[in-house]
Amino acid sequence: MKVMTAMYTIRRGGAYDRFIMMVEAFLERNCETHCLSLTPIPINHSYFHNHVMYLPLKTVDGLIAKLAVVLLFPLWSFWIAWRKNVDVIIAFGSLYAFLQGFSKWILKKPMVTFIRGSSYFGLKIRNSPRYFLHFNKLVEYLGLLLSDRIITNNIATRDEMLKRLGKRKNIDVQILYNNIPPMNIRKPEDIPNTRGKYGIPGDAKVLVSAGILNRGKNVEILIKCLPTIVGINLYLLVVGDGSTDADFRYEDYLKELAKKLEVDKNVIFTGWLEKEDLWKIYLASDLFILPSLSEGMPNVVLEALGCDLPCFGSDISGIRDILQYDELIFDPGDEKTVADKIQQFFTNRQFLDNVKRLCQSRKDVFAFDWKDMVFEIIMGGGAPQSH
């Protein structure tokens, strides 16, 4: 079996982790895997063939690089797919489905597309021009129409895809939830070391939130809650950073807000952490909270559950799919409800025990082999048929 996929470049974040896992799922089953990219993909395997398009540019993030991708990727993917005689095309996002759709159409090869969240929301919070938002929406729609099978990671996204496709019922749309990754870091002695590293007293309570730090993460609601929570020496760890000027301005805004509310000594920005360091912070914390305004299916919540860390999160698609219970979710715009839940968690033993029980039940749901599942969904019953 030969498959072809593409990834502009590998960055930080859960979506890129899942892309690597998807590629590994095929490599572990001895499938010849071809990947188009602008920078080398960090995979070393005899069945992995990375076709890197080297551009004479200082960065792959500029407008010229992106235009080059839109113009050249379709022809380049056709050349690779034809020359290597691939059996299946895998698009990790509707944009890649659009770019590889030419190959699928000419060569009559089936194409499976992963949809992992709303790129429209991400572009909107970065104040992208309106014409670019409309162009992105059109490209995404065409990418969906070219697909033979679509795999989403939450119920709301699946329903949205079905609505956008309208009468194109011959396109198979399925859900594959993210899983809790294998984790082996149970070292209680790390807890005082981790707390000491960030200057957190041993008797303090610790909230943690993590992810790519941008306006969509809505971290300000947690900072605003801190002054209203009484009787608790409470610290907030904000793990992660951004990658754009807008993201950096957002982090500056959060720091200024903490100073204004006089809680800056209790709000700690750690920057980006590798997985093992993040998990150590989870083990040293008391409660994980993700107050995002939009998500696909956040790995940070699943990893927190995997560390047996109780979790609260926004009542939005992706997070609700993971946490499910009303006791664990909240309106991301309701500051009072968030503060009340935090207060109850640390002062009401019955509420605390119930939250832990519910989180354990959700942890059990997501303890499965994602690589087995993704391979089975893509290839189970034979490759999808091209239409």
Label each region the model flagged:
Residues A91-Y96, I115:
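Short His-centered aromatic/hydrophobic patch
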Residues L293:
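Aromatic "clamp/platform" in nucleotide-sugar-dependent glycosyltransferases that forms part
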Residues L145-D172, I180-N184:
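A short, active-site helix/loop in glycosyltransferases that binds the activated sugar's phosphate group
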Residues W272-L273, K280-S285:
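Short alpha-helical donor nucleotide-sugar binding micro-motif in glycosyltransferases
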Residues M4, P201-K217, I223-L226, L237:
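Conserved donor-binding/catalytic core segment of Leloir-type glycosyltransferases
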Residues A68-L72, P110, Y120-L146, D159, ...:
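Nucleotide-sugar donor phosphate/pyrophosphate-binding loop at the beta->alpha transition
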Residues P310-G313:
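Short hydrophobic beta-strand element within catalytic cores of glycosyltransferases
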Residues Y325-E335, Q344-R349:
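Conserved acidic donor-binding segment of nucleotide-sugar-dependent glycosyltransferases
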